[in-house]
Regions:
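Fe-S ferredoxin-like electron-transfer domains
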Residues: 3-6, 66-121, 200
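Eukaryote-biased recognition of intrinsically disordered, low-complexity regulatory segments
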Residues: 15-26
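Short, contiguous acidic and Ser/Thr-rich linear segments
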Residues: 24-34
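A short acidic Gly-Thr/Ser loop motif
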Residues: 33, 53-56, 75, 122-128, ...
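Local cysteine-cluster metal-coordination motifs and their immediate loop/turn environment
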Residues: 46-78
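Gly/Thr-rich phosphate-binding beta-strand-loop-beta motif of the actin/hexokinase/Hsp70
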Residues: 114-151, 281-298, 435
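Short glycine-rich, Thr/Ser-proximal phosphate-binding strand/loop in the N-terminal lobe
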Residues: 133-171, 305-312
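Helical "lid/coupling" subdomains associated with nucleotide-phosphate turnover
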Residues: 160-169, 176, 180-187, 211-215, ...
Length: 511
C-alpha cells in the first residue's frame, strides 16, 4: 500500500480514502480494503500488533466513530478519523546509555573521500532500535537516536517473525528495518549539522534473528528447534549493498553471533564488559522477549537463550503496554495498599514490564498470590488497570524461563547459584526493573539480589567500541568463539527445571 500526499486524487484501480489519525497529528490516503493497521504501518507509525495482525492479542485497539475496534480487523471503506490513544509526543522509554566504558580511538582503515568522517553503531533489538553517531576523527559520541522496531507489526517475538518470513518471505521485514536505520542515521546526521554521506562505517549488533532479517538471510533454521543460525561469523560488508544511504563506500560490520538466538548483541555486551578477563564468576543477563544469558570468567564462558516471551514488553498481559506515558512502571506497598507510579505523572492506562514485576512482588507480599501463582481474585491497581489470573500465569512462564536458564548454566558449569559473585543486567528492561522485585518473584535467585548491577545498553556500547577501535572488533570474534553455546530447547533437564521455577519463592527465600 502506497501513501500519497493528501489530494482529491482517486486511484484508477482502487478507491482511496482519507485516514486522519487525530492524536498522532497525521493524515494519509489508504486504498479501500486495506486494514487500519496497514494504514498505520504505511504511514510510518509503529502500532502494537504483537500477534502479527491476526486479531489475537488485542493490542491494536483504536477508536473509530466512538467505537473501539481492532485496527488489524477493520477495513478501510470510507474516510475515517482514528484515535489510537498514542499522542505524537508520547514515546516509549528506550535506553541508549551503557555503563560509560570507552575504547581507545584506533579505527584502522576508513574509506577516503571526506576530511571529517563520521562513524555509527546500531543496536537492533526485538523491541527498539538505537543508533549512535561518533566523530570519525577522535571517537567522540555526537548523538543517539532511537525508535521502536517496526518489525513488531509482524510479531512480538523472534520466532513469530522468523515464521512470518518463512511463510511470506522476508522482504517486508528486511525492508522496514533497513528503512528504520536510514531514518535514525539521517536524523543523527542532521542533529549534528552534518550529512549522512559523511558516515563511513556502521557497526551493527542484534540477536541472530535481527541479524538474518537485516542481511536478508533466510530464517527457516531459526523458525524451528534447534534454532540454528545460518551465519555466525563476523561480517565486513558494504552499506550500499543493503540500501543504507550513507557514504557510497561505507563499511557495514556485524559483530558475530554465538549460537541459537544468542547473537551479536550479546557479543556486544561481552565487548563492553570484562567477563573474559575477570576472576569472579559473573552472570550476564539481557532480559527481554528473548532472554540471553552468559555465565563465566577468564577460565571460560557458557551461553544460552531462553524464550521468556513478550510479557515483559506488555504483550499477552490484559492491561499490558510498553514503557511509555500512562504506563504503571513501579508499584510499592504502603499500609497494606499498593501505591503506583505512572510514567508521565498522568492517569494510568496500562502496566509495563517493570510495573508487572513490582505488582506481582507486592501481591505476593500482601498474600494476594500464593507460591503456586494462584490469585485470590482480579486485583485492581486503578479503576482501569488490573492483573488477573491469566496475567500471573503469563508472568510465571516468562520469569521461569530466565530462572531456569540461570540454574541450567550453573549446572553445566558445575557450580552452585551462590557461587556467582556478580550479576550484570543489560538492556532497557533490566535498567528499569527493581532487583528486589525480580528476586521476590524468583526470576533471579533471591540470594543474588545484593550482587546485581545494571550496565545499561551494553550491546550498543560494545558496538560503539568496535566502531572506534578495530582491535575491539577483532576481539568480538575471539569472544564469540570462546563462548560455549548450550541449546536449552533440546535439554530435558532444562524442561524439568523450568516446571520447578514456575512457582514463586516461599517467604523464607526472599525475606
Amino acid at each position: 500500500m502506497k501513501l500519497t500526499d493528501i489530494t482529491e486524487q482517486k486511484s484508477e484501480d482502487k478507491m482511496k480514502y482519507k485516514i486522519t489519525f487525530e492524536d498522532e497529528q497525521l493524515t494519509c490516503l489508504a486504498e479501500a480494503g486495506t486494514t487500519v493497521l496497514e494504514a498505520q504501518i504505511a504511514a510510518g507509525m509503529t502500532p502494537d500488533a504483537f500477534c502479527g495482525g491476526n486479531g489475537k492479542c488485542g493490542k491494536c485497539k483504536v477508536v473509530i466513530n466512538g467505537k473501539e475496534v481492532l485496527a488489524c480487523k477493520t477495513a478501510v471503506d470510507r474516510d475515517m478519523t482514528v484515535y489510537t490513544g498514542n499522542k505524537k509526543e508520547d514515546r516509549a522509554q528506550i535506553l541508549a546509555q551503557g555503563s560509560g566504558r570507552q575504547a581507545e580511538f584506533s579505527p584502522g582503515n576508513l574509506p577516503e573521500g571526506t576530511d571529517t568522517p563520521l562513524l555509527s553503531a546500531v543496536d537492533i533489538g526485538s523491541t527498539s532500535v538505537v543508533a549512535y553517531l561518533l566523530d570519525g576523527t577522535n571517537g567522540e559520541l555526537l548523538g543517539t537516536k532511537s525508535i521502536l522496531n517496526p518489525q513488531r507489526q509482524f510479531g512480538a517475538d523472534v520466532v513469530s517473525r522468523c515464521s512470518y518470513a518463512l511463510n511470506n518471505g522476508g522482504e517486508a521485514l528486511s525492508g522496514c528495518i533497513r528503512n528504520a536505520v536510514n531514518i535514525l542515521l539521517r536524523e543523527l546526521a542532521k542533529g549534528a549539522g552534518r550529512n549522512p554521506e559523511d558516515i563511513v562505517r556502521i557497526v551493527m549488533v542484534g540477536n541472530s534473528c535481527m541479524h538474518h532479517l537485516f542481511l536478508g538471510i533466510p530464517t527457516d533454521t531459526l523458525a524451528l528447534a534447534p534454532y540454528t543460525p545460518k551465519v555466525t561469523e563476523a561480517q565486513e560488508l558494504m552499506a550500499a549493498r543493503y540500501d543504507i544511504h550513507v557514504h557510497p563506500r561505507a563499511q557495514l560490520w556485524w559483530l558475530p553471533n554465538i549460537g541459537g538466538f544468542v547473537g551479536a548483541d550479546t557479543v556486544g555486551c561481552l565487548v563492553a564488559s570484562d567477563l573474559d578477563t575477570c576472576e569472579e564468576m559473573t552472570l550476564l543477563v539481557d532480559i527481554g522477549t528473548n532472554g540471553e544469558l552468559v555465565l563465566g570468567n577468564r577460565d571460560g564462558l557458557i551461553a544460552c537463550s531462553t524464550a521468556a516471551g513478550p510479557a515483559f514488553e506488555g504483550a499477552k498481559i490484559t492491561c499490558g503496554m510498553r514503557g511509555s506515558k500512562g504506563a504503571i512502571d513501579h508499584v510499592t506497598v504502603k499500609d497494606g495498599e499498593t501505591i503506583c507510579h505512572v510514567i508521565g505523572e498522568t492517569e494510568a492506562v496500562g502496566i509495563c514490564g517493570s510495573g508487572l514485576l513490582d505488582g506481582a512482588a507486592c501481591l505476593l507480599k500482601l498474600g494476594k498470590i500464593d507460591e503456586t501463582g494462584r490469585l485470590e481474585k482480579e486485583y485492581h491497581f486503578t479503576d482501569r488497570v488490573f492483573l488477573n489470573q491469566k496475567d500471573i500465569r503469563e508472568l510465571q512462564l516468562a520469569k521461569a524461563a530466565i530462572a531456569a536458564g540461570i540454574r541450567s548454566l550453573c549446572e553445566k558449569k558445575g557450580i552452585k547459584v551462590s557461587d556467582i559473585s556478580r550479576v550484570l543486567i543489560a538492556g532497557a528492561f533490566g535498567n528499569y526493573l527493581d532487583p528486589a522485585s525480580a528476586c521476590a518473584i524468583g526470576m533471579i535467585p533471591p540470594e543474588l539480589q545484593t550482587r546485581i548491577t545494571s550496565i545499561g545498553n551494553a550491546a550498543g556500547e560494545g558496538a560503539c567500541m568496535a566502531a572506534v577501535n578495530r582491535e575491539q572488533f577483532e576481539r568480538s570474534r575471539i569472544l564469540a568463539q570462546k563462548a560455549e553455546f548450550v541449546e536449552l530447547a533440546l535439554d530435558m533437564g532444562f524442561q524439568e527445571i523450568y516446571v520447578e521455577e514456575m512457582e514463586f519463592p516461599g517467604e523464607s527465600e526472599h525475606e
